[in-house]
Regions:
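Extracytoplasmic/periplasmic solute-binding protein
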Residues: 1-21, 27, 63-65
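Short helix-initiation/N-cap motifs at beta->coil->alpha
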Residues: 45-60
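Pocket-flanking alpha-helical
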Residues: 2, 53-57, 73-80, 224
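C-terminal lobe and pocket-closing loops
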Residues: 71-84, 95-197
Length: 229
């Protein structure tokens, strides 16, 4: 997810909104050049990490920075309070084209064969009213973020600690904007790019010494395969 934000910060995309492959552009090359320099400072086994590895790395006291929701802080508060009180959530790094946070929206819907659609719709409308969203966000201790800016003025993020206010910049603040990873590619292609982790794999290939040209050729070949499906 954060690699998608990195691409957006440079104005880079692998596919445009019409499905045209845009792999070999100055912006994508900038991302790969930065990725190569960054990779030298990452843990040697980072490419084999699972979803919990970055949390464990940070809570162990060995790590200094991860890109993640505050689950690592929650674990540290429980298992390593001395680490938790030193953690702070802040905005994404800013690139030439701006500051972007990855957005992974979740949708609610009803089965078309449901036997009680009216009641189900009423429930969805009820739980999505601002006052109830506020209660749900508070119940999750601020972990789940509403997708709309007008719902980000809740005090829950400022009230969490230790340290006090550690989650205050977890929602978008200032000039940070949301971006869907792998956008603006058409959904059928974007879903393949995301599911197959094409952007992170490009970073790993560059970090392990592969040339930019070879990495771009590999990415193009992968995307061409998705475009034919």
């Amino acid at each position: 997810d954060w690699v998608g934000s990195l691409f957006s910060a440079y104005g880079a995309a692998l596919d445009d909104a019409k499905g045209k492959i845009t792999v070999d552009t100055p912006e994508v090359r900038q991302v790969l050049d930065y990725s190569k320099r960054l990779y030298a400072f990452l843990p040697p086994d980072v490419a084999s990490w699972d979803n919990a590895s970055n949390n464990k790395w940070l809570v162990s006291g060995k790590g200094a920075l991860i890109f993640n929701p505050p689950s690592a802080w929650v674990v540290a508060k429980r298992d390593a309070p001395d680490v938790a009180e030193k953690l702070w959530t802040h905005a994404m790094p800013k690139g030439p084209k701006g500051r972007f946070a990855p957005l992974l929206p979740r949708y609610q819907g009803l089965w078309n064969f449901s036997k009680n659609k009216s009641a189900a719709k009423s429930l969805l409308v009820h739980i999505n009213k601002p006052d109830n969203i506020r209660k749900l966000v508070a119940g999750a201790a601020g972990y789940d973020i509403p997708p709309y800016q007008k719902l980000l003025d809740y005090k829950v993020w400022d009230d969490q600690g230790p340290p006090p206010g550690t989650l205050s910049h977890y929602p978008n603040r200032g000039d940070q904007r949301n971006v869907m990873p792998c956008s603006p590619a058409p959904p059928p292609i974007a879903s393949q790019l995301y599911t197959n982790a094409i952007m992170p794999k490009m970073m790993v290939r560059i970090g392990r010494g592969e040339s930019i040209d070879k990495t771009l050729a590999w990415a193009r070949s992968e995307i061409e395969g998705y475009s034919r499906q």
